[in-house]
Amino acid sequence: MWPAPCSVGRLLIFFMCSSSGYVVQGCGPSPGARTTLGSPLSLWSIKTPSHIFCTRRAINLGFPSPPLVQLIFWSLNAGLDLYLCLISSCGFSQVFWPVEAFCSFSLSFFALALSHKFVICRLDQHIFSGFTKSLKNLPPCHRTDI
């Protein structure tokens, strides 16, 4: 049996962005715990109206780049975070081939971001040059979001 945070139903709910009001909790061993993975880059909270998923791997390339390039890098990093999270708490490495899972997660984040289902808010004082014009002046996150 997989632990509760790793159930297929919850993953499907997350990826399908349902309107059920479900909040995606972190992948830690304790219920409701949130994890912080990745290098100490800019902290971001990635939210939809019914889901909250926080990651530390929002990428800032440090130089001007086309929005699509930034979105691709962000998607890859978000996919890597989720993959590492599942491995650490669920042992998913025994279920998925690493490359296949990483690519699947990254493509999912990329598709969701393109569909504008995510609202991104900043947790630090730096305004990340966002992927679209609507993200150039990001509202600060509430601490309850993380």
Curated annotation (Swiss-Prot):
Extracellular compartment segments: 27-66, 116-146
The protein's name: Stress-responsive DNAJB4-interacting membrane protein 1
Coiled coil regions in record: none
Taxonomic lineage of the native organism: Eukaryota, Metazoa, Chordata, Craniata, Vertebrata
Role, per record: Promotes neuronal cells survival to stress conditions.
Superkingdom of origin: Eukaryota
Compartments it resides in: Membrane
Cytoplasmic side: 88-94
Induction: Down-regulated in NT2 neurons subjected to stress conditions which triggers neuronal apoptosis such as oxygen and glucose deprivation, followed by up-regulation in surviving cells.
Keyword Membrane: yes
Annotated GO CC locations: membrane
Subunit field text: Homodimer. Interacts with DNAJB4.
Transmembrane segments: 67-87, 95-115
MF terms in GO: protein homodimerization activity
Keyword field: Membrane, Signal, Transmembrane, Transmembrane helix
GO terms of biological process kind: protein folding
